[in-house]
A protein has these predicted regions:
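Surface cap/lid and interfacial helix-loop subdomains adjacent to catalytic sites
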Residues: 119, 128-129, 139-141, 145-146, ...
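Extended hydrophobic secondary-structure segments that form protein cores and membrane-embedded regions
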Residues: 56-59, 89-95, 125, 177-182, ...
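C-terminal helical/tail subdomains of lipid-metabolizing enzymes
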Residues: 51, 148, 219, 223-238, ...
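Conserved small-residue
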Residues: 62, 97, 161, 179, ...
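Active-site gating loop/helix substructures
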Residues: 172-261
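Classical Sec-dependent N-terminal signal peptides that target proteins to the secretory pathway
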Residues: 9-34
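Patatin-like phospholipase
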Residues: 37-41, 50-56, 67-161, 194, ...
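N-terminal secretory signal peptides that target proteins for export/translocation
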Residues: 1-9
Length: 380
């Protein structure tokens, strides 16, 4: 069933978001917190009595740099004593962030009400399997690039995702999940939405595979059209949603604000995968032969929609993203030392911003106010 709604309330809602960005260089003293990246001159944190109805998690794309947000979530689970699937009411992730989101909301085979994987398990996945997904250069990888115009074979991620998710369908996720991808066949974004009953229930393994199909790294993924009424011959050809929404926070807000009573507050935790300093800007991680990809895809690359930096007493977005050295920025640098460095940077970010991190923990541990949720009203 499609839910009609006026877009004006959402536009007004977006303009009332209060954005706090945590940015620091691992080799420098972290700046104080401010209202934007360029105005870090005053300490501004959520008030101690802020108790939002809706708690949203958004996780960026970034390949192996996904170990940065995974380590943050590991610390959150350790200090709250609760799994991510109980702390948040809605989760969205792009690319590697999608894999994290899916894994943390996959129900256990022994107890369908509990998550099978912890954030600690996800960190272990990066440490254990990254080199399988992104093997070092070899004759085999060069042959694969020659034959498919992509750097890596699609078989390793497919095998890992099938082992991880089995036959579990997306609609079994413990909380609503939003995964952005891009349909190059129709030249428009496609969002996997776990809560929409009128669409096919794609296996989590296939959703993950489409989510990480970064142009130039892995080939596109062809899946049946999403509507149950579609002809079996109708298909989608999907690539990594990072080509238009590497940071999915806006889409998370747009799709989740009908989840409950927004007048009682919304808290969005946005986790980045690291950015390089202005002196050493990170090159786009996506590369492809011009003849292979439609020009709209190239124009969309990293064109994340802007988010307003205005204060509101009932909607707060907290973004955590460290500055990382340029030599650690490649999305496919799966060397053990690089993963250790990224994990340590994540820990340093949390430790040096301990007051803010404690406030995040307090918000997540506080029971939600009464009368928060309305059932069955997420938009299709």
């Amino acid at each position: 069933m499609t839910h009609k709604r006026d877009s004006a309330p959402f536009r007004n809602f977006l303009t009332s978001i209060f954005l706090i960005v945590f940015l620091f260089s691992p080799s420098e003293k972290p700046p104080v917190f401010g209202q934007s990246i360029t105005q870090q001159d005053q300490t501004i944190l959520p008030s101690s009595d802020f108790n939002p109805c809706i708690r949203i998690l958004s996780i960026d794309g970034g390949g192996v740099r996904g170990i940065i947000p995974a380590a943050v979530l590991e610390r959150i689970e350790e200090e709250t004593g609760e799994p991510v699937s109980r702390l948040f009411d809605f989760i969205s992730g792009t690319s590697t962030g999608a894999v994290i989101s899916l894994a943390l909301t996959k129900p256990s085979e022994k107890d369908s009400q509990k998550a099978q994987f912890s954030a600690k398990d996800i960190v272990g996945f990066y440490e254990r399997d990254s080199r399988i997904l992104f093997p070092p250069p070899s004759t085999e990888t060069e042959e694969n690039r020659f034959l498919t115009s992509t750097k890596y074979s699609p078989e390793p991620p497919l095998n890992i995702f099938r082992q991880t998710f089995g036959k579990t369908g997306l609609k079994k996720s413990l909380v609503p999940i939003l995964v952005p991808t891009y349909n190059i066949k129709e030249k428009k974004p496609f969002f996997f939405k776990s809560w929409v009953k009128s669409t096919n229930d794609y296996p989590m393994s296939e959703v993950a595979r489409a989510a990480v199909a970064a142009p130039g790294y892995f080939p596109p993924v062809e899946l049946p059209a999403h509507r149950q009424t579609s002809s079996p011959k109708q298909t989608m050809v999907l690539v990594d949603g990072g080509v238009f929404a590497n940071n999915p926070m806006r889409y998370a807000l747009e799709n989740s604000y009908q989840l409950g009573n927004i007048r009682k507050g919304i808290f969005l935790l946005s986790l980045g995968t690291g950015k390089t300093s202005p002196e050493h800007p990170r090159e786009s991680p996506y590369h492809w032969e011009e003849a292979q990809w439609p020009s709209p895809l190239k124009n969309l690359l990293f064109a994340d929609p802007p988010i307003s930096n205005q204060e509101s007493s009932s909607q707060i977005t907290l973004r955590m993203e460290p500055v990382i050295p340029a030599e650690n920025a490649a999305m496919d640098n799966a060397r053990e030392q690089n993963l250790l460095t990224l994990r340590n940077i994540s820990k340093q970010m949390m430790n040096q911003n301990r007051p803010a991190f404690k406030r995040i923990l307090r918000i997540l541990k506080t029971p939600r106010p009464a009368g928060c949720f309305r059932e069955g009203n997420l938009p299709d």
